[in-house]
Amino acid sequence: MRHRHGLRKLNRTSSHRLAMLRNMSNSLFQHELIKTTLPKAKELRKVVEPLITLAKKDTVANRRLAFARLRDRDMVTKLFTELGPRYATRPGGYTRILKFGFRQGDNAPMALVELVDRPEITEAPAEEAAE
């Protein structure tokens, strides 16, 4: 019986699942918006939100804990220099999951995962042709 067991296995071994969630966390911190399946998005939220809470207090111990989870020095630096201060006053709820239709091949429910309060990306102004 799997009563009260709050983990989705996602049809993967534990090492594969850990590596996948680590890679997805790094991608989310790098791009601040990713597209994935809905169950993966819900599991990703459980990994990312505690890391951002950890990054609110910049200590060597917290950086080491984050590095143990992410294994990417650049993402740990971004987490503690940009994301931690950005969400310093927000008491949780750093990610937003938006349903994004269904995948063409297997009809899997898709979702967008984004960090809330992320800066809007403005497109580069088109260079006007010289007259």
UniProtKB/Swiss-Prot annotation:
Coiled coil: none
Keyword annotations of the record: Ribonucleoprotein, Ribosomal protein
One cellular component (GO) term of this entry: cytosolic large ribosomal subunit
SUPFAM superfamilies in the cross-refs: Prokaryotic ribosomal protein L17
Secreted found in the keyword field: no
GO biological process: translation
Family: Belongs to the bacterial ribosomal protein bL17 family.
Protein name as annotated: Large ribosomal subunit protein bL17
Organism the protein comes from: Cupriavidus metallidurans (strain ATCC 43123 / DSM 2839 / NBRC 102507 / CH34)
